[in-house]
Amino acid sequence: PGLEMHRVTGVVDVGDEDFRIVVEAQSQVPRVYIEFTVVNAGEEVWMTDFLTGNWREVPPTASPLDFSNLGGTMIDIIYAVESPELLGVESVSGIETRRIRGTIQSEELAGLVPGAGGGVDIDVDLWVEVHQSLVYQMVLAGQVLSTDKPDTERLLLLGEFDLPVVIDPPE
């Protein structure tokens, strides 16, 4: 509450379930743009204080997004899609994908968006790579969190699979 996320970028080590993300957001009062970083390394989660830039250890629930089990979470989301409809084949970043549209219950997104509320239909579009069935893009439209506006959209872009990454806790 009080923050509106505009962009999240980062890297995920699916094998170790570690991630590093940079969150760009805007506070509501006063209207100030802020940026902070979240690192999940092993059992520890660290976040920069957006005022001082200093690192501090935080509980996992403090992260606005949870990529610690991204592979499993994406599978859970795909299986939870209701009334899936194939819209056709589209290119995403030069990759041939199948675009699938359906709905999902907001609580099914709790693995990705901590605090996701229950009982709200969320529209979901998935762009799934034709040959390996990797999700390259996902759009979630609707009120996932109780603090979201009803027309909130979340765009998740995935790519550069199988590249080595090293995610260490901050020093």
What are the functions of these language-model segments?
Residues 4-9, 33-35, 77-88, 123:
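Short small/polar-residue motifs
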Residues 11-72:
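An acidic-aromatic
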Residues 1-20, 88-90, 164-171:
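N-terminal leader/targeting segments and the immediate start of mature chains
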Residues 23-27, 42, 49-51, 90, ...:
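A mature extracytoplasmic/lumenal domain signature
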Residues 96-171:
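Gly/Pro-enriched, hydrophobic low-complexity segments
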